[in-house]
Amino acid sequence: MIPVVALVGRPNVGKSTLFNRLTHTRDALVADFPGLTRDRKYGRAEVEGNEFIIVDTGGIDGTEDGVETRMAGQSLLAIEEADIVLFMVDARAGLMPADLGIAQHLRNRQKATFLVANKTDGMDPDMAAADFYSLGLGDVHPIAASHGRGVAQLIEHVLVPFVGEKPEEVELTEEEANAAYWAEQEGETLEGAEEEPEDDFNPQDLPIKLAIVGRPNVGKSTLTNRILGEDRVVVYDMPGTTRDSIYIPMVRDEREYVLIDTAGVRKRGKVTETVEKFSVIKTLQAIEDANVVLLVVDAREGISDQDLSLLGFILNSGRSLVIVVNKWDGMSEEDRDHVKEMLDLRLGFVDFARIHFISALHGSGVGNLFVSVLEAYECATRRVNTSMLTKIMQMAADDHQPPLVRGRRVKLKYAHAGGYNPPIVVIHGNQVTDLSDSYKRYLMNYFRRSLKVMGTPIRIQFKEGENPFAGKRNLLTPNQMRKRKRLMSHLKKG
């Protein structure tokens, strides 16, 4: 499961600066959910292909109301949920009484805790870290988060060892993909060029992991129980590895699913909605672990900024998406039309996602959800060969030529699959990285229409072709050498 990293420490020690460094953002992907303090921020980081959830817990001031009182709130919850705790101190201010109190509580929690001395710019790192060894938390990692100094070493020493070595993925090289394409064009049979290892993988043999997420009280609990209570076979309730999330294997229409329930444990027959204890960590982990995400929104409240924040995390994770508008029953036609207008206005950027209007309480529209879930999963895991992708790319270029870059036309050579769930198309060519964003969006939409991809984001990656003459001297031919010799002798006589 994706590890959680909590940043803790006194106010103004640089937690937000380090948060932005690790997540490569200026703000959090998910923030300001009910039940959370406003200075809590959540973000997603990727280190050498390994994903982490970063939590900025806000300042803990041990001198104001007491460390115990402060840490008993949301910051303590984040520490309990975290796999790694980065305890940040201010190297310029030195060791403070609040640091001692926080360190004592972290030692009692027995978490993987690492001491980070920030604001060491302009200082000797060893001298800056010396005072903090008395906290008894092991080595001190000096950094300057505002300038990025020491952050790479911190990641290398703390985060990378935590996840261990990632198995090396077997990918089709550029030469293999190019050879496969031209072999298909010429009708030749090139052994090994048809990406045979992928033929052994059939996504239909695996259960679809389906996560139901949304803000509190939008009906996730009711929808979960409605799904489990209708014509399907529930195998058993199996606690998952995510904190408080429940993995529920089930079968519907002879298709296996694993329902990732983020609403907590409940009795199967209970469908009454209660105020849910919302956990951002639990929700983000469920999204990362799912194949398809059902995002539930309240028809009576419309699309809120919190819904859009959660939607942004789903898209950044590359997960397939089905939008569920719940509590549709009992609304007047005028109110329904208004809701649909707002959905069109605020969700125009996810036009690939199916939208379902349901009543989880009464069951209307719930059965149709699985049609879109299957469609999204099949589109996200579909295998498309190099020949087909290159043909679509050429059709797109014929319909709308690539623009000129520095007076030269961008040349698209060939395309091949770069990954699945979400689908990734890799386009090779000259100057392709200089293409405008508008043309990149055009190519993405063209591939989506041609492949009929629905319910899942699609990503386009661009790779420059190598110049075979780069770094080589321009050698003259024997004929050119003779001409050059005659020209030089003529100039000397003149």
From Swiss-Prot:
Q: Which PROSITE patterns match?
A: G_ENGA
Which positions does UniProt annotate for GTP 1 binding?
A: 9-16, 56-60, 118-121
Instruction: Identify the SUPFAM superfamilies for this entry.
Output: P-loop containing nucleoside triphosphate hydrolases
| A Pfam family reported for this protein in Swiss-Prot or TrEMBL | KH_dom-like
Q: Where is the EngA-type G domain?
A: 3-166, 208-381
Source organism's superkingdom? Bacteria
**Keyword Lipid metabolism attributed:** no
Keyword Transcription regulation attributed: no
According to the UniProt entry, its GO molecular function terms are: GTP binding; ribosome binding
* All copies of domain KH-like, residue ranges: 382-466
Q: Which GO terms describe its biological process?
A: ribosome biogenesis
Q: Which UniProt keywords apply?
A: GTP-binding, Nucleotide-binding, Repeat, Ribosome biogenesis
Where GTP 2 is bound, by residue?
214-221, 261-265, 326-329
Q: How does it assemble?
A: Associates with the 50S ribosomal subunit.
Q: Which family does it belong to?
A: Belongs to the TRAFAC class TrmE-Era-EngA-EngB-Septin-like GTPase superfamily. EngA (Der) GTPase family.
| Biological role stated in the UniProt entry | GTPase that plays an essential role in the late steps of ribosome biogenesis.
List the protein's name: GTPase Der
